[in-house]
Amino acid sequence: MTGQQRALRWLAAGVLVLWCGGFLRAENTEKSMVRALILTPPTVAVQSWMVSLLYQFPEAAADASDAAAKVQLCTGQGNTLQTALTEAERGLPRKASYRLCEYLLLNAETTLKTIRQAETVLKEEPVQGLSARVLCMDLSGEELAAADGENELFPEQLLQVVKEAAPQAPHLYESRNALLAPVLILTDGAIENAEEMLLLTETGNTRLTPAESQMAQLLLGQSGEHTFPLDGGQVTFRRCVVSVEAVEDGFAVTLTGQRRAGTALPTAAQCAALEQLCVQTVQRCWENGYDLLSLGAVRALKQGTGREALTTKNACPQVQADVSFLQF
């Protein structure tokens, strides 16, 4: 190898090292990592969009969702969602990166129409947030800003509660005709996950009761334990298999559950109460525009597509539920 070749190799190696160093610095320390987007649509009182960003800087730029940098909050307002987002980004110490943005928080007064508007913006670069988990907050943008001003740890606490509630939350891309989202509330300055869930449909928003919320999650097959306070004590489903069958003009819903270890087998009266709650939840969702168990699809599979499609525009069909638990 000649001296000129060695010099060229050393030069190439030096350029590579400099490029790698610059790339790593740009990726890992020079960006504000947005962890959650908080959207508040226009209201009668405030006729503009408000966007808040939960972010970490700079350590959070590592490729780990558990980055340890301090969580902070910045807010922007604008006549459109895009201008409000741009204004919020101006409050960041560095350019925004949405690589770790896994959550979309919406005001509890948000409609499905608002979510459609948000999808249009969030699917674009650089956000690309259609896979984000959707949660609702029972507080306005002003209340959010006030809570942040009173407690410097509020953003950290908010992100922690969001993470805990995330398994119950749907992805944004799942919000075709309806969305069933957990609700965060502010109590004595602390943020917490409410027991009720919010059903957003084309016809409006409906707040489910705590029992209906648990049953809806169970019927949707969401993982985790589901507990119901009933006469005679709590009943907890550790696991549950849900089956739906079209029977004549109605439907039969069967829930076969496994109880929590160390608990007594639920009584016949408790199973009957759960059956009633199941029917009540399915009917309430249907009446508010949400086919919780995809009954229309079940009917179409059995009868074919030649007959009139069953949708929530029709009266809710008869639903009969049967709840049983395994002996072990």
Residues covered by each model-derived region:
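Membrane-proximal alpha-helical signals and transmembrane carboxylates
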Residues: 2-328
